[in-house]
UniProtKB/Swiss-Prot annotation:
HAMAP family: DapE. Belongs to the peptidase M20A family. DapE subfamily. Catalyzes the hydrolysis of N-succinyl-L,L-diaminopimelic acid (SDAP), forming succinate and LL-2,6-diaminopimelate (DAP), an intermediate involved in the bacterial biosynthesis of lysine and meso-diaminopimelic acid, an essential component of bacterial cell walls. PANTHER family: ACETYLORNITHINE DEACETYLASE, N-ACETYL-L-CITRULLINE DEACETYLASE. Its cofactor is Zn(2+); Co(2+). Pathway: Amino-acid biosynthesis; L-lysine biosynthesis via DAP pathway; LL-2,6-diaminopimelate from (S)-tetrahydrodipicolinate (succinylase route): step 3/3. Gene3D superfamilies: 1.10.150.900, 3.30.70.360, Zn peptidases (3.40.630.10). It comes from Bordetella bronchiseptica (strain ATCC BAA-588 / NCTC 13252 / RB50) (Alcaligenes bronchisepticus). This is Succinyl-diaminopimelate desuccinylase. The active site is at residues 70, 135. Binds 2 Zn(2+) or Co(2+) ions per subunit. Keywords: Amino-acid biosynthesis, Cobalt, Diaminopimelate biosynthesis, Hydrolase, Lysine biosynthesis, Metal-binding, Zinc. The keyword Hydrolase applies. It is an enzyme of class 3 (hydrolase).
């Protein structure tokens, strides 16, 4: 198949305005293609979210491609040089919402699977795709529930490639063999409201909170390790008061987030925060939300297969990285021992005029196909 096969499918997907969590039949289009080459396709839907599980073969190893058909809203349409849902070729790029994140990856893998099956119809092992329309949104009815379903069935995943746009300067320069965890907190410090002229009759929660936050910001939570940078603590929001300058507020709220490595656990981070707050004598309420545990795939079969495929196709030696935000890889890592993320350049994702280089579509497809060959056809 030529590069046009990938391009045609990408265009079909971009033309469907699948703003999260609406799939707009993107997955139906994929299922029709996959069923023609022997995949068994199943829709798992909940809460307005559409998920596709498509599998070909029953044996091991099971290699999975994971992705999402949903996209973020395009923002002001008048800021785009062309309609975000009318795929447009211009100056060597394909423009449209989802072009880089991540409809090109999905199209490239589907065509790669078609080529692989055509060349190896009796291939060993199994190939599957896990596609959701709830990655850009709350991510509560998407990949996570499919993983729960697969666990309950006893389906054993061996390898998973998540098609996130990981490349930075050139296709193949970076892939992600892990991600940091995310732990958020909402801290409410209680005071006593009063008149600023009579501070002895009030208790200012801002004054109480400030030294505690200063201490938390200064803490070295860990030193990271060979795979992850040190854990970070960032205050993202502060709120107190009525807007008046003559009223001592009755409460103060701080929102904060940890991005943490495998060098720390959520329990350790929580305990240390509580120790600081208690030592400062605060009257407080602290609510926690664990966005995801960190995961890591050390060098092994999957990383070697992908890095080798990238080098064969592009000549680049891919860097293994764990930087960036969270992804659905955090859910898949619970049921799959080896997870890696790889896709096109990410410079324009979530931006106006999102785009992908047309010349990268065929190499992306070839890298996915070569990775399948390395994993399933190796002696």
């Amino acid at each position: 198949m030529t590069a046009s096969a990938v391009l045609d499918l990408v265009k079909d997907l971009i033309a469907r305005p699948s703003v999260t969590p609406d799939d707009v039949d993107c997955q139906m289009l994929l299922a029709q293609r996959l069923e023609r080459i022997g995949f068994q396709c199943e829709t798992i839907a909940r809460g307005g979210v559409t998920n596709l599980w498509a599998r070909r073969g029953a044996g091991a190893p099971l290699t999975v491609f994971a992705g999402h058909t949903d996209v973020v809203p395009p923002g002001p349409r008048d800021k785009w040089d062309s309609d975000p849902f009318v795929p447009t070729e211009r100056d060597g790029f394909l423009y449209g919402r989802g072009a880089a994140d991540m409809k090109s990856s999905i199209a490239a893998f589907v065509v790669a699977a078609e080529e692989f099956v055509a060349a190896h119809p009796e291939h060993p092992g199994s190939i599957a795709l896990l596609i959701t329309s709830d990655e850009e949104g709350p991510a509560v009815d998407g990949t996570v529930i499919v993983c729960d379903e697969l666990r309950q069935r006893g389906e054993q995943l061996d390898y998973c490639i998540v098609g996130e746009p990981t490349s930075t300067e050139a296709l193949g320069d970076v892939c992600k063999n892990g991600r940091r965890g995310s732990l958020s907190g909402r801290l409410l410090v209680k005071g006593v409201q009063g008149h600023v002229a009579y501070p002895h009759l009030a208790r200012n929660p801002v004054h109480q909170l400030a030294p505690a936050l200063t201490e938390l910001v200064a803490i070295e939570w860990d030193q990271g390790n060979e795979y992850f940078p040190p854990t970070t603590f960032q205050v993202s929001n502060l709120h107190a008061g009525t807007g008046a300058t003559n009223v001592v507020p009755g409460e103060a709220v701080a929102l904060f987030n940890f991005r943490f490595s495998t060098a720390s656990t959520p329990g350790q981070l929580k305990a240390r925060v509580h120790e600081v707050l208690d030592r400062h004598g605060l009257e407080y309420q602290l609510d926690w939300e664990l966005g995801g545990e960190p995961f890591l795939t050390p060098r092994g079969s999957l990383t070697d297969a992908l890095v080798s495929a990238i080098q064969a196709e592009t000549g680049l030696q891919a860097e293994l990285s764990t930087t960036g935000g969270t992804s659905d890889g955090r859910f898949i890592a619970r049921i799959c021992p080896q997870v890696i993320e790889f896709g096109p350049c990410n410079a324009t994702i979530h931006k106006v005029n999102e785009r992908i280089e047309l010349s990268s579509l065929a190499p992306l497809k070839n890298i996915y196909r070569r990775t399948l060959e390395n994993l399933l056809l190796a002696d």
